């Protein structure tokens, strides 16, 4: 049985560490958030959404594979910016069910966040070529490449 408060606390701790790391990278390479795409698979997707949407300085875009929103009530209170978001999920995912993509899409739409989604047929909890290609095109479009 999941303890949602424990999960939320741990995700906040990880988010803080992730933001510190991103700040270090931004400083080392003289980057702003507008030059960064956050991306992740499974828990990495969850952290990319939390990190990307709770920073006051918007990221260029967020790409998430096979993830979900960790705690909708918590994230609702903490959203500070928007980014173009692409969520990709396999319809046969038995680790993080595909229904999480639809829930995340609904949540993001209600928060006026530009969301794109792709469900990959006959795909489990992995990133097939079709997902990588879709993500690459989305990233290139967002960076005008």
Regions found by a protein language model. Name each.
Residues 86-89, 93:
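Short beta-strand/loop motif that positions the catalytic acidic residue
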Residues 50-54:
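Active-site signature of alpha/beta-hydrolase-fold catalytic machinery across serine-
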Residues 102-145:
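C-terminal catalytic histidine-bearing segment of alpha/beta-hydrolase fold enzymes
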Residues 80-85:
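Short, proline-enriched alpha-helix->beta-strand connector loops that line the catalytic pocket
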Residues 57-69:
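A conserved short beta-strand
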Residues 39-44, 48:
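Gly/Ala-rich beta-loop-alpha elbow adjacent to hydrolase catalytic centers
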Residues 30-40:
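Alpha/beta-hydrolase fold nucleophile elbow
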């Amino acid at each position: 049985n999941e303890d949602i408060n424990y999960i939320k606390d741990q995700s906040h701790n990880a988010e803080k560490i992730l933001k510190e790391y991103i700040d270090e990278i931004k400083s080392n390479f003289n980057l702003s958030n507008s030059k960064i795409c956050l991306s992740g698979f499974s828990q990495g997707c969850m952290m990319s959404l939390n990190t990307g949407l709770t920073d006051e300085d918007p990221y260029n875009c967020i790409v998430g594979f096979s993830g979900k929103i960790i705690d909708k009530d918590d994230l609702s209170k903490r959203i500070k910016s928007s980014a173009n978001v692409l969520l990709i999920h396999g319809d046969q995912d038995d680790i993080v069910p595909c229904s999480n993509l639809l829930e995340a899409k609904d949540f993001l739409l209600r928060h006026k966040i530009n969301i794109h989604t792709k469900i990959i047929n006959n795909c489990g909890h992995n990133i097939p070529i079709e997902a990588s290609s879709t993500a690459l095109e989305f990233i290139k479009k967002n960076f005008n490449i």
